[in-house]
Protein backbone atom coordinates (compact mmCIF):
# COMPACT_ATOMS: atom_id res chain seq x y z
CA UNK A 1 0.00 0.00 0.00
CA UNK A 2 2.85 2.37 0.79
CA UNK A 3 4.22 1.97 -2.75
CA UNK A 4 0.81 2.81 -4.19
CA UNK A 5 0.64 5.97 -2.05
CA UNK A 6 4.14 6.97 -3.16
CA UNK A 7 3.15 6.34 -6.78
CA UNK A 8 -0.04 8.42 -6.43
CA UNK A 9 1.86 11.29 -4.77
CA UNK A 10 4.47 11.22 -7.53
CA UNK A 11 1.75 11.03 -10.19
CA UNK A 12 0.11 14.18 -8.78
CA UNK A 13 3.40 16.10 -8.61
CA UNK A 14 4.98 14.94 -11.87
CA UNK A 15 2.51 12.91 -13.96
CA UNK A 16 4.53 12.74 -17.19
CA UNK A 17 7.81 11.89 -15.46
CA UNK A 18 6.15 9.28 -13.23
CA UNK A 19 4.42 7.64 -16.21
CA UNK A 20 7.68 7.69 -18.19
CA UNK A 21 9.68 6.04 -15.40
CA UNK A 22 7.05 3.39 -14.66
CA UNK A 23 6.39 2.59 -18.32
CA UNK A 24 10.09 2.40 -19.16
CA UNK A 25 10.78 0.14 -16.18
CA UNK A 26 7.93 -2.21 -17.06
CA UNK A 27 8.95 -2.39 -20.74
CA UNK A 28 12.46 -3.21 -19.51
CA UNK A 29 11.13 -5.98 -17.25
CA UNK A 30 9.22 -7.37 -20.24
CA UNK A 31 12.40 -7.50 -22.32
CA UNK A 32 14.43 -9.07 -19.50
CA UNK A 33 11.73 -11.74 -19.20
CA UNK A 34 11.74 -12.32 -22.96
CA UNK A 35 15.51 -12.75 -23.07
CA UNK A 36 15.55 -15.12 -20.11
CA UNK A 37 12.56 -17.18 -21.27
CA UNK A 38 13.32 -17.16 -25.03
CA UNK A 39 17.08 -16.72 -25.50
CA UNK A 40 18.25 -16.01 -29.03
CA UNK A 41 21.67 -17.58 -28.61
CA UNK A 42 21.94 -18.38 -32.31
CA UNK A 43 22.25 -14.68 -33.10
CA UNK A 44 23.52 -13.09 -29.87
CA UNK A 45 25.63 -14.91 -27.33
CA UNK A 46 24.72 -13.91 -23.81
CA UNK A 47 22.38 -11.28 -22.51
CA UNK A 48 21.74 -8.27 -24.80
CA UNK A 49 21.81 -5.19 -22.55
CA UNK A 50 21.33 -2.85 -25.51
CA UNK A 51 18.09 -4.62 -26.39
CA UNK A 52 16.79 -4.01 -22.86
CA UNK A 53 17.92 -0.38 -23.06
CA UNK A 54 15.95 0.01 -26.30
CA UNK A 55 12.85 -1.40 -24.60
CA UNK A 56 13.27 1.03 -21.69
CA UNK A 57 13.80 3.97 -24.07
CA UNK A 58 10.75 3.04 -26.14
CA UNK A 59 8.60 2.60 -23.04
CA UNK A 60 9.70 5.75 -21.25
CA UNK A 61 10.25 8.24 -24.07
CA UNK A 62 7.70 7.08 -26.64
CA UNK A 63 4.95 4.80 -25.37
CA UNK A 64 4.37 6.50 -22.01
CA UNK A 65 3.42 9.77 -23.70
CA UNK A 66 1.40 8.16 -26.48
CA UNK A 67 -0.40 5.86 -24.02
CA UNK A 68 -1.19 8.67 -21.58
CA UNK A 69 -2.59 10.84 -24.38
CA UNK A 70 -4.53 7.92 -25.86
CA UNK A 71 -6.28 7.08 -22.58
CA UNK A 72 -7.23 10.73 -22.11
CA UNK A 73 -8.69 10.82 -25.63
CA UNK A 74 -10.63 7.61 -25.01
CA UNK A 75 -11.96 8.94 -21.72
CA UNK A 76 -12.78 12.50 -22.80
CA UNK A 77 -13.78 12.11 -26.46
CA UNK A 78 -14.96 8.54 -27.01
CA UNK A 79 -18.29 8.07 -25.29
CA UNK A 80 -22.00 8.29 -25.98
CA UNK A 81 -23.13 11.71 -24.80
CA UNK A 82 -26.50 10.44 -23.57
CA UNK A 83 -24.92 7.79 -21.30
CA UNK A 84 -22.93 8.08 -18.06
CA UNK A 85 -19.13 7.82 -18.45
CA UNK A 86 -18.98 4.34 -16.89
CA UNK A 87 -22.05 2.91 -18.65
CA UNK A 88 -21.38 -0.49 -20.24
CA UNK A 89 -22.06 0.90 -23.73
CA UNK A 90 -19.22 3.42 -23.33
CA UNK A 91 -16.91 0.67 -22.14
CA UNK A 92 -17.74 -1.40 -25.24
CA UNK A 93 -17.22 1.63 -27.48
CA UNK A 94 -13.83 2.43 -25.92
CA UNK A 95 -12.64 -1.16 -26.15
CA UNK A 96 -13.71 -1.30 -29.81
CA UNK A 97 -11.92 1.95 -30.68
CA UNK A 98 -8.83 0.89 -28.73
CA UNK A 99 -8.64 -2.52 -30.39
CA UNK A 100 -9.66 -1.49 -33.92
CA UNK A 101 -7.68 1.77 -34.13
CA UNK A 102 -4.81 1.86 -31.64
CA UNK A 103 -3.71 -1.79 -31.73
CA UNK A 104 -3.47 -2.18 -35.55
CA UNK A 105 -1.46 1.06 -35.81
CA UNK A 106 0.54 0.69 -32.60
CA UNK A 107 2.13 -2.62 -33.57
CA UNK A 108 3.75 -1.43 -36.84
CA UNK A 109 4.84 1.71 -35.00
CA UNK A 110 6.54 -0.44 -32.33
CA UNK A 111 8.30 -2.67 -34.88
CA UNK A 112 9.46 0.41 -36.83
CA UNK A 113 10.78 2.18 -33.72
CA UNK A 114 12.63 -0.95 -32.62
CA UNK A 115 14.19 -1.36 -36.08
CA UNK A 116 15.38 2.26 -36.09
CA UNK A 117 16.84 1.95 -32.58
CA UNK A 118 18.57 -1.29 -33.65
CA UNK A 119 20.27 0.69 -36.44
CA UNK A 120 18.43 -1.24 -39.12
CA UNK A 121 16.88 -0.05 -42.37
CA UNK A 122 13.21 0.57 -43.12
CA UNK A 123 13.33 -2.63 -45.19
CA UNK A 124 13.92 -4.54 -41.97
CA UNK A 125 11.01 -2.71 -40.33
CA UNK A 126 8.82 -3.67 -43.29
CA UNK A 127 9.98 -7.28 -42.97
CA UNK A 128 9.12 -7.32 -39.26
CA UNK A 129 5.69 -5.87 -39.98
CA UNK A 130 5.07 -8.31 -42.81
CA UNK A 131 6.12 -11.31 -40.72
CA UNK A 132 4.78 -10.34 -37.31
CA UNK A 133 1.93 -7.80 -37.59
CA UNK A 134 -1.01 -10.11 -38.23
CA UNK A 135 -0.09 -12.93 -35.80
CA UNK A 136 0.78 -10.36 -33.13
CA UNK A 137 -2.48 -8.49 -33.72
CA UNK A 138 -4.47 -11.73 -33.40
CA UNK A 139 -2.74 -12.45 -30.10
CA UNK A 140 -3.44 -8.86 -29.03
CA UNK A 141 -7.15 -9.39 -29.70
CA UNK A 142 -7.08 -12.61 -27.66
CA UNK A 143 -5.43 -10.87 -24.68
CA UNK A 144 -6.45 -7.23 -24.43
CA UNK A 145 -10.21 -6.74 -24.99
CA UNK A 146 -11.27 -8.41 -21.74
CA UNK A 147 -8.63 -6.59 -19.71
CA UNK A 148 -9.46 -3.26 -21.35
CA UNK A 149 -13.16 -3.80 -20.62
CA UNK A 150 -12.26 -4.08 -16.92
CA UNK A 151 -9.80 -1.18 -17.18
CA UNK A 152 -12.34 1.18 -18.78
CA UNK A 153 -15.09 0.08 -16.39
CA UNK A 154 -13.50 0.29 -12.96
CA UNK A 155 -10.00 1.83 -13.11
CA UNK A 156 -9.80 5.63 -12.65
CA UNK A 157 -8.33 7.49 -15.64
CA UNK A 158 -5.10 8.46 -13.86
CA UNK A 159 -4.34 4.79 -13.12
CA UNK A 160 -5.25 3.24 -16.48
CA UNK A 161 -1.77 3.49 -17.98
CA UNK A 162 -0.27 1.91 -14.85
CA UNK A 163 -2.87 -0.89 -14.92
CA UNK A 164 -2.07 -1.54 -18.57
CA UNK A 165 1.67 -1.44 -17.90
CA UNK A 166 1.49 -3.97 -15.06
CA UNK A 167 -0.49 -6.43 -17.19
CA UNK A 168 1.71 -5.51 -20.14
CA UNK A 169 4.80 -7.02 -18.49
CA UNK A 170 3.58 -10.28 -20.02
CA UNK A 171 2.58 -8.56 -23.26
CA UNK A 172 5.94 -6.77 -23.51
CA UNK A 173 7.69 -10.10 -22.98
CA UNK A 174 5.74 -11.41 -25.96
CA UNK A 175 6.35 -8.26 -28.07
CA UNK A 176 10.07 -8.33 -27.37
CA UNK A 177 10.15 -12.00 -28.35
CA UNK A 178 8.23 -11.31 -31.60
CA UNK A 179 10.49 -8.35 -32.42
CA UNK A 180 13.61 -10.49 -32.04
CA UNK A 181 12.12 -13.52 -33.82
CA UNK A 182 12.43 -12.09 -37.35
CA UNK A 183 16.03 -11.11 -36.68
CA UNK A 184 16.89 -14.59 -35.39
CA UNK A 185 15.22 -16.34 -38.31
CA UNK A 186 16.67 -14.19 -41.05
CA UNK A 187 19.90 -13.07 -39.36
CA UNK A 188 19.40 -9.62 -40.87
CA UNK A 189 22.62 -7.61 -40.55
CA UNK A 190 22.71 -4.21 -38.87
CA UNK A 191 23.37 -1.33 -41.29
CA UNK A 192 24.73 1.67 -39.47
CA UNK A 193 25.02 4.97 -41.35
CA UNK A 194 28.57 6.14 -42.05
CA UNK A 195 30.09 8.39 -39.40
CA UNK A 196 30.69 11.93 -40.65
CA UNK A 197 33.66 13.67 -39.03
Curated annotation (Swiss-Prot):
User: Where would one find the signal peptide in this protein?
Assistant: none
| Protein topology in the membrane | Multi-pass membrane protein
Protein's cellular compartments: Mitochondrion inner membrane
- Its chief place of residence is mitochondrion
Q: Where are the membrane-spanning stretches?
A: 20-40, 55-75, 97-117, 137-157
Q: Name one Pfam family in it.
A: Mpv17_PMP22
Query: What family is reported?
Result: Belongs to the peroxisomal membrane protein PXMP2/4 family.
What does the UniProt record say this protein does? Answer: May be involved in cellular response to stress. Required to maintain mitochondrial DNA (mtDNA) integrity and stability. Required for ethanol metabolism and tolerance during heat shock.
PANTHER family linked: PEROXISOMAL MEMBRANE PROTEIN 2, PXMP2 MPV17 (PTHR11266), PROTEIN MPV17 (PTHR11266:SF17)
Protein's name in the database? Protein SYM1
> Which species?
Saccharomyces cerevisiae (strain ATCC 204508 / S288c)
Amino acid sequence: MKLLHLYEASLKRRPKTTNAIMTGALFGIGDVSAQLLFPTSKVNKGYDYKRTARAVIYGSLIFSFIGDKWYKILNNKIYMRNRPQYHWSNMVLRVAVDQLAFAPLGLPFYFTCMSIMEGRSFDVAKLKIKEQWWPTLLTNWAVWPLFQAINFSVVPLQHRLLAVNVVAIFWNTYLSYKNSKVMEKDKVPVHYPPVVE
